[in-house]
């Protein structure tokens, strides 16, 4: 395969990996709220949505930071 073909394949794979699966769009969000913003380096992306986090954890957004966190519940 030529280098141009490899670059095209790599680009398509990158776009495919960034797309949210259609099957996950209709899922409800997990209960609870995200806790206060953590002290982390800028723009860390551990997850894309709640269903990419283990157990009860939620995918929490803090600016450009996305990470799996245990939810908090407010009464």
UniProtKB/Swiss-Prot annotation:
Keyword NAD listed: no
GO biological process: antibacterial humoral response; innate immune response; venom-mediated disruption of cell wall in another organism
Domain annotation WAP: ranges: 27-72
Keywords for the protein's UniProt record, in alphabetical order: Antibiotic, Antimicrobial, Disulfide bond, Secreted, Signal
Main location: secreted
Tissue-level expression: Expressed by the venom gland.
Name of the protein this chain belongs to: Carwaprin-a
Stated family: Belongs to the venom waprin family.
Transmembrane helix keyword on record: no
Record Pfam families: WAP
Record's function text: Damages membranes of susceptible bacteria. Has no hemolytic activity. Not toxic to mice. Does not inhibit the proteinases elastase and cathepsin G.
GO molecular function terms listed in the Swiss-Prot or TrEMBL record: serine-type endopeptidase inhibitor activity
Gene Ontology CC, one term: extracellular region
Organism name: Tropidechis carinatus (Australian rough-scaled snake)
């Amino acid at each position: 395969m030529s280098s141009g073909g490899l670059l095209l394949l790599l680009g398509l794979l990158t776009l495919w990996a960034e797309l949210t699966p259609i099957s996950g769009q209709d899922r409800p969000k997990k209960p609870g709220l995200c806790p206060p913003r953590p002290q982390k380096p800028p723009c860390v992306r551990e997850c894309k949505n709640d269903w990419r986090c283990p157990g009860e954890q939620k995918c929490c957004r803090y600016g450009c930071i996305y990470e799996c966190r245990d939810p908090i519940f407010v009464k």
